[in-house]
């Protein structure tokens, strides 16, 4: 009997130890830090966001900026750290032209294949380079390289301030050198209100600059208005943010800032005003 008790106690101890070790070796995240994945917004307003991923060469940036300026269109550029290091003057010109920016990692790895430490390093290196060069932040917008993400990626990037993971609902696949006509038809045939369009700035996307004017004219003819990602999401970079604490309610937060519950709910895409959570980052409208 005594021997059985010893064996049983040893088994319980081992099970407990395994559980504890498993728990403490898992990455820890603030509750509610998970990044929100956005492929488009749901609206009846004819708005569209043109986005450009900038790899290490940025060959077409000057031509893209010229076209956007000619048609008075603002876009969003997702920057890699290598791009910032490789062509800083072009990055400055993006900011000077009034376009929005986001973080596209430093070296463009699959985030689903690297460690959480590496993910954070990829983001922080790019953020530091962009801030030092332009004084602007890439937060809270992250575009995952190759569009690849999983729960761990979303938890990790969210925990360091990238609360919006921006994907797309229209991929032009311009990087493979396809014709301007194919790029144009991909956009015009799939456009819906609230769309996010993916294009690239690199040399591989050699017909993007030829397609861009026709895309802009075609969408304008359909009644579309061009906006940046911050505008599409109702986020102004100068707006105040508030981190939800234990005991908070949307009503109390709204009273504190002199706005309505509905205003906070709308700008943060909250469908149930009773469901907010500790650690949630809320944008406060002005």
Regions inferred by a protein language model and the residue ranges of each:
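Active-site beta->alpha N-cap acidic-glycine motif
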Residues: 33-113, 118, 125, 129, ...
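Structural recognition of the beta-strand scaffold that forms the well-ordered cores
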Residues: 48-51, 75-79, 100-105, 140-144, ...
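Primarily a LysM-type cell-wall glycan-binding module
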Residues: 236-258, 262, 280, 286
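His/Asp/Glu-enriched short active-site or ligand-binding loop at hydrolase and phosphoryl-transfer sites
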Residues: 148, 153-190, 224-235
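Soluble non-cytosolic domains of exported or imported proteins
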Residues: 55-59, 78, 85, 113-120, ...
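Sec-dependent N-terminal signal peptides of Gram-positive bacterial secreted proteins and lipoproteins
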Residues: 1-30
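C-terminal domain-boundary segment and adjacent tail
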Residues: 35-44, 71, 85-86, 206-238
């Amino acid at each position: 009997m005594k021997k059985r008790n010893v064996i049983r106690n040893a088994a319980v101890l081992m099970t407990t130890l395994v559980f504890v070790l498993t728990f403490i070796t898992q990455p820890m995240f603030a509750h509610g830090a998970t990044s929100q994945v956005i492929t488009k917004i749901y609206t009846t307003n004819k708005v569209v966001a043109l986005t450009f991923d900038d790899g290490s060469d940025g060959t077409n940036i000057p031509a893209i900026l010229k076209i956007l300026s000619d048609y008075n269109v603002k876009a969003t550029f997702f920057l890699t750290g290598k791009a910032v290091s490789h062509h800083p003057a072009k990055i400055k010109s993006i900011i000077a032209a009034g376009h929005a920016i986001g973080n596209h990692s430093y070296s463009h790895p699959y985030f689903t294949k690297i460690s959480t430490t590496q993910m954070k390093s990829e983001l922080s290196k790019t953020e530091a380079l962009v801030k030092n060069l332009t004084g602007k932040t890439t937060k809270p917008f992250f575009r995952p390289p190759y569009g690849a993400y999983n729960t761990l990626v979303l938890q990790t990037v969210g925990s360091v301030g990238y609360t919006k993971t921006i994907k797309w609902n229209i991929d032009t696949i311009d990087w493979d050198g396809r014709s301007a006509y194919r790029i144009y038809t991909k956009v015009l045939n799939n456009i819906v209100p609230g769309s996010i369009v993916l294009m690239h700035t690199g040399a591989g996307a050699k017909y993007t600059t030829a397609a861009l004017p026709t895309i802009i004219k075609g969408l304008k003819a359909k009644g579309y208005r061009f906006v940046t990602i911050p505008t599409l999401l109702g986020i102004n970079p100068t707006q105040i943010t508030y981190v939800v604490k234990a005991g908070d309610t949307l009503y109390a937060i709204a009273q504190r800032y002199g706005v309505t519950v509905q205003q906070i709910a709308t700008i943060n895409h909250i469908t149930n005003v009773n469901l907010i959570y500790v650690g949630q980052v809320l944008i406060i409208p002005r």
